[in-house]
């Protein structure tokens, strides 16, 4: 049964240009050779690659593991420090005065450039402040800041002294913040008086106050960065609240903090998943393996060169911001753009303005942003100079072929490879991806595994699907990789049950995938997003991809609903592009497209014209809510605090009620 991605793939295999291949960090031949070594002789491969990092003490054993019982240990006995690898190692080189962080504020008139030496000095000073407040190795520090340089400085300062940082996205509510405080029990909180997003102020200190009032934990110290300068209505508790700038300007504060020598398996950070499926999980990453994963993938996936300016649009509140805005770039000595704003402010040309302003060479963003900007047309793009770009990236969800083609043609001008990266908070670093000078791309496919990663497809009985040709199944990973999570913080049982119990001997990703005849992987969506229509398994992502092939459609989300005859029917929420009129003609067009690209079995039973879709702030569609609305369960929708725009849900409920009446 063909689907949109397969149809597109048969038409389009996009190979890197001869010029790109000539200058790339790796060739296809070397990729195949190194990948083979990484699977057949992982100890040799990872021992060599670990020398990319600076170790205070070398490891005694590369890898010990009992994967069936979720026990993994990398670089046993090795000692290192993350901030040392991101900063100190560069200070005695010509990189000392190279731009490390290029900060672009929400307001286009605000910007800052911090060199490696600037960041090094700030991190040392703030590390000493943390120590002054009694923070020591193993203590947790909760960070609730906007996208400003102090966010990167804070987490690097934590790594310098061995404290475990837990960054909470600045858009989360006081309730979401409180649940994370209760779970990780921080010694100290770092926040700001407020922030800006899309020209609008966001309250941060106030949210921290509300969270701490309700929290079971008694946090004694809150350090506040002055971002807005608006102190009206700011509650201040002497003895608890301290201004960041006041502390940093203390003339007696030492300018150097000796980096803590950390064991490779010492905890580095806790990052909570979005909470779209019940209680948030505190994903725990450790020091050596995580940093090596972020460092190595950044070098190869983004084909980084010393002169590049690189921009990952993700917030540091998400794992993409951790790995590919801070730790991956800085450990490689790269210049990393950090953006406080949104793509639509002050107008829909903001991304292109930033690329033009800084001469960005490598651009890494999410399909959600790409599709939103597609709706705005080409006018904003044509006014900007994007000629500096040489590589594009996609992250967060599968990119549908139409968005891929638009991105390739209009942003990359047909010359920039696109790395469509599949990975998770839990994996720590990129797992399946094209290497841009080596692996030909297929629009919509994540392509092939990174070094040391063994993705397999298993059936529902846990049997590995080894057939050649086109096959589908549950995406699992066979064997350990350095940057994998080591546990759910404070809940080892949940770690095993969530990731290792369903398919014995494998890490279960929760995603479904298809592997084509060339061995390329196509992510078809979460396994719980599979709709069983008359005994046929239909991936929601497949239907969504077909729907958005229509030039009138901006976005689509598909869920199953109870059907008297078929067991489950297909219900499609469809958002059209600006200026498009919704009518029965368009509805028939969409159904016809799905039938043509997948088959009649996949035709939507209902098309619901949606003004928007309920998404988390990281861009993930909350299908759990959509399923409940379809079923008429308008109450008890669960935690909606992670939604970017809760009003969308109410509108969908009203539409559904009208539809029923």
UniProtKB/Swiss-Prot annotation:
GO terms for cellular component: cytosol. Its EC number is 6.2.1.1. It catalyses: acetate + ATP + CoA = acetyl-CoA + AMP + diphosphate. The modification N6-acetyllysine is found at residue 620. ATP binds at residues 396-398, 420-425, 511, 526, 537. It holds the Pfam family AMP-binding. One of its GO terms (biological process) is acetyl-CoA biosynthetic process from acetate. InterPro entries: Ac_CoA_lig, ACAS_N, AMP-bd_C, AMP-bd_C_sf, AMP-binding_CS, AMP-dep_synth/lig_dom, ANL_N_sf. Mg(2+) binds at residues 548, 553. Acetylated. Deacetylation by the SIR2-homolog deacetylase activates the enzyme. CoA binds at residues 197-200, 320, 534. GO terms for molecular function: acetate-CoA ligase activity; AMP binding; ATP binding; metal ion binding. Its cofactor is Mg(2+). Keywords: Acetylation, ATP-binding, Ligase, Magnesium, Metal-binding, Nucleotide-binding. Signal peptide: none annotated. Gene3D superfamilies: 3.30.300.30, N-terminal domain of ligase-like. CDD domains: ACS. The keyword Magnesium applies. Belongs to the ATP-dependent AMP-binding enzyme family. Catalyzes the conversion of acetate into acetyl-CoA (AcCoA), an essential intermediate at the junction of anabolic and catabolic pathways. AcsA undergoes a two-step reaction. In the first half reaction, AcsA combines acetate with ATP to form acetyl-adenylate (AcAMP) intermediate. In the second half reaction, it can then transfer the acetyl group from AcAMP to the sulfhydryl group of CoA, forming the product AcCoA. This is Acetyl-coenzyme A synthetase. It comes from Leptospira interrogans serogroup Icterohaemorrhagiae serovar Lai (strain 56601). The lineage of its organism: Bacteria, Pseudomonadati, Spirochaetota, Spirochaetia, Leptospirales. The gene is acsA.
